[in-house]
Amino acid sequence: MSSSRPSHSSSNSARSRHSARIIAQTTVDAKLHADFEESGSSFDYSSSVRVTDSVGGDQPPRSDKVTTAYLHHIQKGKLIQPFGCLLALDEKTFRVVAYSENAPELLTMVSHAVPSVGEHPVLGIGTDIRTIFTAPSASALQKAMGFGDVSLLNPILVHCKTSGKPFYAIVHRVTGSLIIDFEPVKPYEVPMTAAGALQSYKLAAKAITRLQSLPSGSMERLCDTMVQEVFELTGYDRAMAYKFHDDDHGEVVSEVTKPGMEPYLGLHYPATDIPQASRFLFMKNKVRMIVDCHAKHVKVLQDEKLPFDLTLCGSTLRAPHSCHLQYMENMNSIASLVMAVVVNDGDEDGDTPDSANPQKRKRLWGLVVCHNTSPRFVPFPLRYACEFLAQVFAIHVNKELELENQIVEKNILRTQTLLCDMLMRDAPLGIVTQSPNIMDLVKCDGAVLFYRNKIWRLGITPSDLQLQDIAFWLSEYHMDSTGLSTDSLYDAGYPGALALGDVVCGMAAVRITSKDMLFWFRSQTAAEIRWGGAKHEPGEKDDGRRMHPRSSFKAFLEVVKTRSLPWKDYEMDAIHSLQLILRNTFKDIETMDVDTKTIHARLSDLKIEGMQELEAVTSEMVRLIETATVPILAVDVDGLVNGWNTKISELTGLLVDKAIGKHLLTLVEDSSVDIVKRMLFLALQGKEEQNIQFEIKTHGSKSECGPICLVVNACASRDLHENVVGVCFVGQDITGQKMVMDKFTRIEGDYKAIVQNRNPLIPPIFGTDEFGWCSEWNPAMTNLTGWKREEVLDKMLLGEVFGLNMACCRLKNQEAFVNLGVVLNTAMTGQESEKVSFGFFARTGKYVECLLCVSKKLDREGAVTGVFCFLQLASQELQQALHVQRLSEQTALKRLKALAYLKKQIWNPLSGIIFSGKMMEGTELGAEQKELLHTSAQCQCQLSKILDDSDLDSIIEGYLDLEMVEFTLREYYGCYQSSHDEKHEKGIPIINDALKMAETLYGDSIRLQQVLADFCRCQLILTPSGGLLTVSASFFQRPVGAILFILVHSGKLRIRHLGAGIPEALVDQMYGEDTGASVEGISLVISRKLVKLMNGDVRYMREAGKSSFIISVELAGGHKSQKRA
């Protein structure tokens, strides 16, 4: 298949190609079926290759009589398998309009074990079905006919009136009729006493639990687990997972067999082996069983007065086609069970939860297939359980596919970024001469750049002469397009395709200019296919005419011998993106310099906007937290409470000022200490837990009411560098609900007074009986959903109350429906279930999001008699607070990116300045010039150190390494004296104690220089014009080193009140007593932490007319000092 196009929507192009392929394949299927019916046992299976080739290419197939007859045969076949019988009823009269020939014998035959009373009922056209079943059975069937989606009740247990034999009735609707399959309940079976899916779910509980416990990231492990579980659940000799590829051919990707059986793992087979019509039926009926391929089929007799032929497509008894039976016999498979794996179509877009049709487009990903070497019957309840298991498997497959697509797209974006970088350095040859190159952009065997009449080749490619011939062919036959992609140059019409051999079959080409092009090549598909099945023995001869897995594999290789793997849409998107990049590069190749001034101006604007936005968001968030109607508290990294809003203060009776500073573990009940300790530990590691329940103590007048029960979500608070600096807990008070549940568990059966109570503390509650019928629906649920109690009682909870199409409360998608079934089933089997997210559309159309808590309902003997479901709703304030929090995080991330960019851009000119300084050191300079150069070098070193400080937490926590050197303070005097504009603008002199400055010391001189400069700047800003700044040093020696006192005085202050100097709030920030530190406050905090790393500390002293920073550090004396001593 080839595609010649300048650009296309990926989803639309894929969908249109897929539709065309289905139509073409259906025509092939029809021709093969007709050939088989005509040839019978002499059918040559290898003809599938010839038929495929005759319809191949891009020519649209014609809809002829053969195709029409084939589709009619598929849909209107009148044969069933003999393991059961079939009746079709008129919905209005309950009279039979069609029946299988074996129905009278199975349903009306007299049993000698049951005494006969009166005449035996006769079954035929026009018979009232209520006359051949017992009264309860007839009533159950009559009730089923009144259901909108009657399949929700399957299977219905019925008993024949004459024989008393039990049957499972499996009901489905077709146009104007109700079709019922009757399957006998085997003597060894324990018949299900109730209808509905919930009972069947129990059979697959273990398998579902195992699937859900698997970590994501491995499709192979997921398939292996599914196949193993199905193998154990069904008891067949072989279980396999089939995957359909993009071109509709299939592959066995996982397999489990009994010992001694020939493996089929790795087998590929042509698309014709599973016809498109069969795939369509698998989309409708998710499970298909063949009990015995040798069994004689039973005819279905239809009322001649019916104006149309009945379709049996939805029947569980529908007979398989003769060609499929022949295939099964040849592979020694007598019985089979097939489950469809239906996933979301990844090409579908535009679906939203609020759209009129919330269902996404679906596609058949593959099949889970079981084979048996002897006849095997699986009861309908177990088949239903397998269907549900396949639905859960499909959800996980869908998630793995989404994860794979994200990884692929991420890798493509990364490679594109690297290619862009190469183009900036060496355009355009960098994409073929450096690594990574264009072969890393998409999966291929070779790539070529055709640029300025020269050729650069990578990997396996055609020769230069062949490449020129391909380029000429493209310009001759595809001159109007900017590119071509095909999985078969032969099918695309390239005359020299056969001469290229197996090495080059598929090609993607894009035109950059009228003369320059890029090519990617792929070898034939067969080169990448390796069958993992039984090896071919030298003496064994294959008969390609027989329908058999080995023949399928051989036929598949024949079909794909001139084809490569198809080019996926995301790969073509990546190729077209590179094409556009190259075009722009060629246009701007002489003007590649970027206007950095514009970028810096934009970043500056972004920084200002980000600050204003962050401040606004922060103020709003603080207001919301304080006024929220849900309890919110926060702790720092030590577990000490630093946030306690009004609501939690009201609930606990503990005032804010009393709570601040207390350890969280001292405020919770002893029974909850371990839970909170674990949650706090994980949150500080960045692992945020959801829906954690614990009890917190009450105080004062509230202590008499007992502890408060909270369900909280832990949210790690992070700084600009994504380091965790605390934990915020957003809670929901469920004390009232817990009291209800505690009381419920203590009451023996009489719970109506609680459930139907209109007290606003009672949460929304609904429940089911053991058979899945809705048995409870309290007033809170009525208020929430808009559906009254009498409107939902005695409806199937799964399907009628909560479902997809005509349900009262419509769910978002199939995945939500399956997940609800899993949760209910888990509770029904007696297992403890966790709270899960749940959402549905209320009667008004509003989408309700909540938490669902499911509890089993027990009788006096402890047996499960149903489930109770409690809903917890998030308040409007909480939702708004979370929204504001997300905005805050996004703003912080934007600022962090801008900061990272600025730091990177500063490094380049700084390196240039350092280099220039080193070059000047080799020139003849005067003493004053040398001093200035030395000062400049020290300032550059300080700036370099600061740029390397990417992790401020390591400084704050004391994990920074100091670089120890000998120095004198005099050397660094110029650094902090001349580096402040305020000194010159205000005319403030800095007086130094020159004598003490000459002392030789040993320590981290650059960090000490940073500290001095920071504290000087802080004082200079707040010192009025004409003031004075004094820096003095004094020493006294100890055996372990020297202690340095530096006093920074601000004299002649013109402030009229005592205590003049820096604001008290800034001092608090320096000591870490104010969590909302400003930029100046953060700078002082870092400087103080650096001093503490030098075994010192900082004090701030206010005196009359002046104030001082007193900095003490412990430094060793240098060699000169030691000599003097």
From Swiss-Prot:
Single GO term (MF): photoreceptor activity
> What keywords are annotated for this sequence in UniProt?
Chromophore, Photoreceptor protein, Receptor, Repeat, Sensory transduction, Transcription, Transcription regulation
Regions of compositional bias (Low complexity) in chain numbering? 1-14, 39-48
Q: Which GO terms describe its biological process?
A: detection of visible light; red, far-red light phototransduction; regulation of DNA-templated transcription
Gene3D superfamilies this protein is in? Answer: 3.30.450.270, 3.30.450.40, Histidine kinase-like ATPase, C-terminal domain, PAS domain
Every copy of the PAS domain together lies at: 617-687, 750-821
Record domain GAF: where:
218-401
Protein's job: Regulatory photoreceptor which exists in two forms that are reversibly interconvertible by light: the Pr form that absorbs maximally in the red region of the spectrum and the Pfr form that absorbs maximally in the far-red region. Photoconversion of Pr to Pfr induces an array of morphogenic responses, whereas reconversion of Pfr to Pr cancels the induction of those responses. Pfr controls the expression of a number of nuclear genes including those encoding the small subunit of ribulose-bisphosphate carboxylase, chlorophyll A/B binding protein, protochlorophyllide reductase, rRNA, etc.
Designated name of the protein: Phytochrome A
